[in-house]
């Protein structure tokens, strides 16, 4: 059966050159080298509306290029602004895909989504062409009931920009840090305060069920000695 599915996908690519095709994750069954070469993107997981999807997406940086990792941002009317921020930042870990009931949400939520999409446009080249330099999900001991902090960092192809993601599940308020020697904070998105002192980038998370933040850092120019 699987061999026939592979033949079918290959036939589609041959018959329709340039086709942008998503390979369904099928519970992760298709996260293998054969299927990853057949489509333009592979859905990262079936955890579309689960908060634990952020941990799954981070861990998949070990085996997939994020430019091929389609991540659903499923936006629902019952979600709080905190949950919407969390969902949008989760999707920014890979190739963002909006879903849910966007026609039924409040103007506040639509504003968060629009701002998130605009922010993603400014970082997508790092997602597409960069290199992941930090994967940290060690605090998370259960995907079904995650608790703790997860981090991800990815640098641009030229090494001049650094993208830092942080997610917190049900922890007291705390500061989450990233090594950032020689970098300054250029922008951030999320429901968390962010800063960078030239040595560390920091984001304050926690104190609520879900919180998340993403920061874009840029390397400072060293002054040339006369």
Walk through the language-model features, giving the residues of each:
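Solvent-exposed beta-hairpin/edge-strand motifs
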Residues: 179-191
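Glycan-recognition surfaces
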Residues: 2-104
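Catalytic cores of secreted or luminal carbohydrate-active enzymes
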Residues: 88-137
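C-terminal beta-strand-rich structural cap/linker in extracellular carbohydrate-active enzymes
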Residues: 196-226
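Short, glycine-/Ser/Thr-/acidic-enriched flexible segments
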Residues: 28, 169-171, 190
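Short, exposed beta-strand/loop patches in secreted or surface proteins that constitute
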Residues: 151-155, 192-198
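Carbohydrate-binding surface patches
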Residues: 140-182, 212-216
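Conserved active-site loop/cleft motifs that coordinate metal ions or position small ligands
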Residues: 20-22, 163-166, 185-186
